[in-house]
Amino acid sequence: MSLDRPPLGMRLSDAFGAWAIRRLAREIVVEGIERIPKEGPVILVGNHISWLDPIFLACWLTPETGRAINWMGKAEAMRWPLVGTFLRVNGVFGVRRGAADLEAFRLAEGVLRDGNVLGIYPEGTRSHDGKIGTFRDGAALLALRSGAPVIPVAVSGTEQLWPRGALLPRRAARIQMVIGEPRRFTYSAGDRPALSLVAEQMRAAVAALLPHEYRP
């Protein structure tokens, strides 16, 4: 069952995460939270530069909107001691990367069918150089099958807060999140060329919100 309103464990986790991020980042900029609707299905699509990205989003968006974010995350992380428990408490369900994971796709469709918020990183992995990569078709297929609005979310600076391969976080000068306008896509879900087109339009919407150095 997907999450709508954040349970106590998620609220406590978000509060701790926000406290920790405020201590590490000298400046935090968040724009456009008001663009996330208070109810109904929503797909959040974003660029992925650090494993902290979903934590940053959840710690600011969930308290402000009162809505839990159900995340698609890598399946192997769900098996890590303590980390897997933390992820499940925070609405993450696993996706096997490199293959079509029908079970995860059905779970994602269930989140939207229940009228809840789904968060996806369509690149499928973190960027190695900070620049936004190619979006895979899965998020586009979910958008077309569900009819849910898609909201682009651009994050920058989190890769400095916790660099790839680092064991511990570092101080960061500035981290930023910009939330764009919602958009609905009306192509047929069975139209393969349309899937690639929608995926590229999603990517372009996120890229337009990013600082120039993060754009392709």
Please report, for each region that a protein language model flagged, where it lies by residue.
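A generic local structural motif
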Residues: I28-G32, L57-A58, F105-L107, P163-G165
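A short beta-turn/loop motif at secondary-structure boundaries
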Residues: E34-P37, P169-R170
